[in-house]
Amino acid sequence: MTQTLSQLENQGEFIRRHIGSSAEQQKEMLATVGASSLNDLTQKIVPRDIALPEPPDVGGGATEQQALAELKAIASQNKRYQSYIGMGYAPAVLPPVILRNLLENPGWYTAYTPYQPEVSQGRLESLLNFQQVTIDLTGLDIASASLLDEATAAAEAMAMAKRISKLKNADRFFVADDIHPQTLDVVRTRAETFGFDVIVDKAEKVLELDGVFGVLLQQVGTTGEVHDYADLIAQLKQRKIIVSVAADLMALLLLTAPGKQGADMVFGSAQRFGVPMGYGGPHAAFFASRDEFKRSMPGRIIGVSRDAAGNTALRMAMQTREQHIRREKANSNICTAQVLLANIAAMYAVYHGSKGLKRIAGRIHRLTDILAVGLQKAGFTLRYKTWFDTLTVEVADKAAVLARAEKAEINLRTDTYGAVGITLSEATRRDDVIKLFSVLTGTDDKLDVEALDKELMTESHSIPASMLRSDEILLHPNFNRYHSETDMMRYMHRLERRDLALNQAMIPLGSCTMKLNAAAEMLPISWPEFNELHPFCPPEQAQGYQQMISQLSHWLVQLTGYDVVCMQPNSGAQGEYAGLLAIRRYHESRGEGHRHICLIPSSAHGTNPASAHMAGMTVVVVSCDKEGNIDLVDLREKAEESGNELSCIMVTYPSTHGVYEETIRQVCEIIHQYGGQVYLDGANMNAQVGITAPGFIGADVSHLNLHKTFCIPHGGGGPGMGPIGVKAHLAPFLPGHSVVQMDGLTEQRAVSAAPFGSASILPISWMYIRMMGSQGLKQASQTAILNANYIAARLKNDYDVLYTGHNGYVAHECILDIRPLKEEFGISEMDIAKRLIDYGFHAPTMSFPVAGTLMVEPTESESKVEIDRFVDAMLAIRAEIGKVAKGEWSLEDNPLVNAPHVQAELVSDWSHSYSRETAVFPTLETKANKYWPAVKRLDDVYGDRNLHCSCAPVSDYQ
């Protein structure tokens, strides 16, 4: 044997697992694009003045086994105390059937946001279930398919209240004083940039105020009191004040729906429906509204429509409200939400059904009653007379109680003067209540659970009669069919089969970076060491998290060329918002708060102008030249015109047009010359890592899409993570947190509910970087560039590649111009996108950043075989367009305009001018491995004109 021990140890094994093409395949591809090596190709494409001499040092790579062992040792430093802190977070029980078949299933977690509904019907149905749960429990008319977290939802409710308010001169937003503190923190952050005056007081005090456009109430206060706000809401409605209510999804199973009491909006966290606390996330927020306000709602909304055959089909409705279309005029900057977590919550409701859910809520409440009465009989005073699951217990010797709790490995809420807080959960059992009683009393007296249970069956008054829910909920068959594990498993599998995810085919979406989410990266998110921690637990109990976050932050600092990284933003859009806030606060600290203009190239992603608007900035668009690059003449003119009002520029690199702009350093210099800051959008970081870096280029701040470049899966539309890196001068202006103070958090207000955002998915990115190492990360970027150029080279004779760099190359993605084909032959980018489904592919990004185009991003994870399959499909489709051009098929009847084709058409009457085989088996590969779309092409116009965003009525099933 001629190999050394080092070679046999195979430390770089994961690199070869992550990168799809072999060395031999890469040689063939390099020859096609005219390069001798990956380094040669990189030197031909990347401007020399921004190229790093060596990749940043994040260490060597590790095997999967080594990295998992290292991370397990780190995770074991976390202390898994029983948490009764509450404050919007509670232990939850995720049924194993959902854990295995959804959360740990790549068929669910590797899908993309359902912009292509024909290949997304499974998760669209699940999201419709989520909306139905929200509608039923809140008592309102329409719901969204998730927001980022409860605190963000509160901020969105405030913004929406202002949009829909008829009191146009009012600028005050009133918040009841027993809202969760982290929610108030985020609301204040948003209000600051909108110029709203936030007033916090006891709820009834709002009636004494003028100039109030909206009110935020919390049905179950943060310290446990259950409020009947029906009368107050009625009085507020008489004054035309918009009312939002924060609600607990578990409590709503027993409590009157706020919508029935007159609330205009109801929101909260769905975490308690089977999603672990995870040190703060990810968790789906729910959001519901009255029907009359639906076009002002934030977030994605799933609607019922029909397909080309007239069959019922689902789609994302009313997209004209959203950032990718309305840009700075959008209702919100939300792009990625929390689809995977919403689907978990929806399946939790499906599995338990109405009776099961009420049983769980009833058990939580009964145990709370038992503990409450037991403590009262032992001489304790409860601060409130009403509760669902949370007690605020007054204690004479708080230090002694907390010492006993520490010894028993129990966390209580400690921030209430002269009292401790206790929130029970689905995970609480009678032995836990007995243990809590002993901790509080400090005696050997044992709580008599059985006796108190009998007493409380007839005499519990902790929920006022007026607040008890009396209506039926979750009557739809989906919540009443799948209560055995066999049925539930099959239901989830049936939905999974309707979707096209990375476990079946390449998803070549430009600007989305749909790369491998390796199994080894995903394993740690199911570990209890990461799952069970409350985000507000004492820092000494989260040492494992702190070490993991510190290491990941250090690696990201190295890779970006920045000085500090903040992990709080829980999506890319939130990262943009946080970065722009840092810029705003920096200018204010220098007495330059008048700087408010944000320059944005015309090619920018829609979140950029939407985020700038949210940050209180004025958007000024900078033109691009005919090559797709930022027009430096126009940029300088706009910067000079802005003068001392220039705040920043938001620029994506490589550009959204898919090229490395040669003048990026000049762009940075011009902005700095006029006193502005450079925000470099990290959406295309997959073409930078190890090759260049935003801090090295000259930028001041960037967000990083960990769900793109650093392997967190898209989850069908979330979760995401958008940490921001900044230069040292912006570091003091990064987000802080009102509840948790520790190293890494500033004194600024928060942008997310939890101090470290969706912390429990950060191990995915930690694993990726640890296993790839410095050289592996650079090789990944280089391979992504190679794959994109290989596609462009193979397709350029049949499709126009819209933009290239000065030497004819693209970056990590390429834009195919379909406009000439549409003008000459009548075939659109939509027709090609839908026809690709028949070939077994998800479509590239349509009409972004240029209308009438397809943007293709293959990533480094796809093999040459799969890339060739995609190229061959595109060439075959071009040949089909040729048949239309020659008149062999009419423009009205051909396999492109009729695509996609469904299985039922094989056994239906066939009147088309092309064969069934041409329709559904266009290649030999599709005969061997066919993906069948569940529906034909969606009728978008019908869906928006006949908006229906809940499950079909029960009568349809009778």
Curated annotation (Swiss-Prot):
The modification N6-(pyridoxal phosphate)lysine is found at residue 708. The keyword Oxidoreductase applies. Its EC number is 1.4.4.2. Belongs to the GcvP family. The keyword Manganese does not apply. One of its GO terms (molecular function) is pyridoxal phosphate binding. Its cofactor is pyridoxal 5'-phosphate. It comes from the Bacteria. This is Glycine dehydrogenase (decarboxylating). NCBIfam families: gcvP (TIGR00461), PRK04366.1 (NF003346). The gene is gcvP. It holds the Pfam family GDC-P. Keywords: Oxidoreductase, Pyridoxal phosphate. It is an enzyme of class 1 (oxidoreductase).
